[in-house]
Structure formats: structure tokens, C-alpha cells
Curated annotation (Swiss-Prot):
Keywords: Membrane, Transmembrane, Transmembrane helix. Pfam families: T_cell_tran_alt. GO terms for cellular component: membrane. InterPro entries: TCTA. Its main location: membrane. Residues 76-100 are annotated as: Disordered. It is a single-pass membrane protein. The keyword Cytoplasm does not apply. This is T-cell leukemia translocation-altered gene protein homolog. It comes from Danio rerio. One of its GO terms (biological process) is osteoclast fusion. Belongs to the TCTA family. The chain crosses the membrane at residues 35-55.
Amino acid sequence: MEESWDFEFLSRMVDSLVSFLSEFVDDWLANDMRVAVFKILFSWLVVSLVAIHFAWKVYGNTVNDMYYRQGTGGQNGGTPDTHLSGWESAAGDAMKTHRE
């Protein structure tokens, strides 16, 4: 019983996709306004992805080094523990440490 429902659902999905594509091709050939907007947006997407790719090629190592820079304040080079504000250092609590 479920197999016929799956086939029917799949058949409807394929039919709707084919009808959408045929309508899109008709609009494309007629040079409809929706196609012009699609071309502009698709061109913007492609140009943006190419620009991101080239920017990553140029600045990728710098960004990676900034994220993983070595320092005394932890994994990402945060501020050291000696630069606590007045109320944090005045509390007098012992610093918590990680124990396994």
C-alpha cells in the first residue's frame, strides 16, 4: 500500500518539476521580465562566489593565523589572567583549574 503512495508522490513531484521547467524555458525564450531578474540574481551569485573564492585565496592564511594565533591567554590568544578587573581580583576566590 505504501509503495503505491510513494510512487504517486514521486510522480506528482516529477510532473510539477517538468511543468515548472517547461514554463521557465518558455519564459526564457520569450525573454520575460522574470527571466531577466533571474539572470541578474544568478550573475550576482556567481560573481559573489568567485570574489569570495579569490579573497579566500589571498587572505585565507591571514584569517587562519588570526584565529589560531599563539598567545598566553588560551586557544585563541585572549587576554592573560593577570589583567583581571578590580572586582574580579578583589573577590579573593581561588582560580579554578581543570583537573582530569
